[in-house]
Structure formats: structure tokens, C-alpha cells
Amino acid sequence: MAEPRYRRILLKLSGEALAGKGTHSIDPNMLDYYAEEIERVHRHGVQVAVVLGGGNIWRGNQAIARGMDAAQSHYMGMLATIINALALQDALERRGIFTRAMTAIKMDEVAEPYIRRRATRHLEKGRVIILAAGTGNPYFTTDSAAALRAAEVHAEVILMAKNGVDGVYSADPRRYPDAKRFEYISYMEALSRGLTVMDSTALTFCMDNNIPIIVFDPLTPGNIERIVMGEHVGTLVSSHPSQ
């Protein structure tokens, strides 16, 4: 059997990924789908950390645009990610995968507090960890949380799931059919062109800490497994094409 290309990954999923075709809430079918996708790589002995967004439950920017205090809205978004984390934890545990939900905001009755060494130890023991509540601070996105946690737990790569898009394009392919998809792009070029990889703060952090990012379509079954086994899927964003 082939050996995995990556041994420790961080998977970034948007909250909308769990909503399926709905605009809000959690679709049980999507929970089962992502649990199966994670299980496929877990079987290879790959250590998996997951960071979830909360946009299926709370759209913070829309609330801010209507006048809500920004910090208040951001904290509500953090709570939304915890709901998503508990739902995914349940879906994974029903498949027999030991899973720990860890939160950047303490709520001991619900999940473990995020402690870097404890998170790393869970990974070493073969447990999937779901890292919720972003960074625990307002004004930072879950993209920034993914970058920060990837650095802290020494993930080899961030798998950046983008619903409906199979990589990084020169322009929005849904609006510009002739947009070019990149097989590889450097951090600096992605930043200078303002391309949609992750927010600029998170992307700069990944560049400074040399954390490669693979942007891919998670709705193609088996894509996560293909990536960890070394197949080229989506777009690699890094300092060098062979990273």
C-alpha cells in the first residue's frame, strides 16, 4: 500500500459546507459526507485537525452591516463554529473515530479547552481534533484560526476546502468562463493579485511560517484522500512548486 504524502493535515471547512443546498443550519447528509471523507484519510494513519467556520448559522458581516457591534457579532460567529464542531464530532464518533472538540473559548461542560500540547497529543494518539471558536478573539476570521492552529500543531499542509471551486483562478470562474486555474501559485503572487485563497492576514501568516495550502473542491468524493496520498488536486499555494 502506498504511503501518504502528508502525515498531519489541517482541514479547513466553511460553515456553509455543512449546510448543503440549504442556506442555513446543518444538513445531516453533509455531516455524514464529510465524516466519511475524513474517515478515508484517517484509515491511512493520517493525523487530522479540522477548523470549521460558522456561516451556515451566523453571518457576522451582514449583522455588522446592519449596525451590530462588530465584536459582539464575531463572538456569535465563534459560538456558531462550536455548534458545527459538536455536530461533526458526533458524525465521526458514530463511525467509531475517536474525536475531540476543542474550543478557544472555555466551556468545559461542552468541549475541551484548546491547549496546544494537549491537541498535539490527541493527534499523536490517532484522534481527530476539531478546533472551534476561531482564535478566541474578535476581528480574526476562521481562516486566521486555521493558519494559527496549523502552525501550533505542526500540520504539514492546510487543505482549504472551497465549495463549488476546484482551485485558485485568475478571476471568478462563475463570472468569467475564460478564467485560468492555477496548478501552483506563490503566496506573494496570490497576495499581490488579491486572489481568493484565504483572507490576507491568514495568507501572510502562512507565508511567514512556510505552511503550504492546497485549495480544492471538497464535494468531489475522495479528493481529500487523493491529496494526502500525493495526487495533484486543486491549486498548491506555497513558496515552491515542489513543496
Curated annotation (Swiss-Prot):
Keywords: ATP-binding, Cytoplasm, Kinase, Nucleotide-binding, Pyrimidine biosynthesis, Transferase. ATP binds at K12, L13, S14, G15, G55, R59, N163, Y169, D172. It catalyses: UMP + ATP = UDP + ADP. It is found in: Cytoplasm. InterPro entries: AceGlu_kinase-like_sf, Asp/Glu/Uridylate_kinase, Uridylate_kinase, Uridylate_kinase_bac. GO terms for biological process: 'de novo' CTP biosynthetic process; UDP biosynthetic process. Coiled coil: none annotated. Inhibited by UTP. One of its GO terms (molecular function) is UMP kinase activity. Its EC number is 2.7.4.22. It comes from the Bacteria. UMP binds at G54, T135, G136, N137, P138, Y139, F140, T141, T142. Transmembrane segments: none annotated. Homohexamer. NCBIfam families: pyrH_bact (TIGR02075). Catalyzes the reversible phosphorylation of UMP to UDP. HAMAP family: PyrH_B. This is Uridylate kinase. It comes from Roseiflexus sp. (strain RS-1). The lineage of its organism: Bacteria, Bacillati, Chloroflexota, Chloroflexia, Chloroflexales.
